[in-house]
């Protein structure tokens, strides 16, 4: 139960941070391109790599800190960072084909799922 509360608290913090960063980017770059989403995905991916290495290998942080920061805060900030970390882990462990398949499947199937959801709702309305 403690971990669930930590994930929830971290997720709330990460979601608010994502919203604020999105607004900040929108004010600076305008609405013509999704700069906020790109910025969040790239910075979230950097942070998950940095924190995973720092927390797990340099700091020896508690499972609670890992759950709060990585699953909670960064999970609320961007799930693209988790996808990126999983893909890199597969590639670093020599599972090149699995890693590439995971990347292609994640992006391709997610795009198809969004398209299917849009099409279904448009057909219902």
Curated annotation (Swiss-Prot):
One GO term of the biological process aspect: cellular detoxification of fluoride
Transmembrane segments: 4-24, 32-52, 68-88, 100-120
Binding site for Na(+): 75, 78
Principal location class: membrane
Pfam families per record: CRCB (PF02537)
Activity regulation info: Na(+) is not transported, but it plays an essential structural role and its presence is essential for fluoride channel function.
One GO CC term on file: plasma membrane
Keyword Transport attached: yes
A single GO molecular function term of this UniProt record: fluoride channel activity
Localization, UniProt: Cell inner membrane
Keyword Cell inner membrane: yes
Known catalytic reactions: fluoride(in) = fluoride(out)
InterPro entries tied to this protein: FluC (IPR003691)
UniProt keyword list: Cell inner membrane, Cell membrane, Ion channel, Ion transport, Membrane, Metal-binding, Sodium, Transmembrane, Transmembrane helix, Transport
Superkingdom of origin: Bacteria
UniProt membrane topology term: Multi-pass membrane protein
Function in brief: Fluoride-specific ion channel. Important for reducing fluoride concentration in the cell, thus reducing its toxicity.
Family stated for the protein in its record: Belongs to the fluoride channel Fluc/FEX (TC 1.A.43) family.
Protein name: Fluoride-specific ion channel FluC
Organism of origin: Rhizobium meliloti (strain 1021)
Gene (UniProt): fluC
């Amino acid at each position: 139960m403690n971990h669930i509360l930590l994930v929830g608290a971290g997720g709330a913090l990460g979601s608010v941070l994502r919203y604020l960063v999105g607004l900040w980017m929108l004010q600076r770059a305008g609405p013509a391109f999704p700069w906020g989403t790109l910025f969040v995905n790239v910075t979230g991916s950097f942070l998950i790599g940095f924190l995973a290495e720092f927390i797990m290998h340099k700091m020896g942080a508690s499972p609670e800190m890992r759950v709060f920061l990585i699953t909670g805060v960064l999970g609320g900030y961007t799930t693209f960072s988790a996808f990126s970390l999983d893909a890199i882990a597969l590639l670093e462990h020599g599972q090149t084909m699995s890693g590439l398949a995971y990347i292609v499947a994640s992006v391709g199937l997610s795009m198809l799922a969004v398209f299917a959801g849009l099409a279904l709702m448009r057909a219902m309305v």
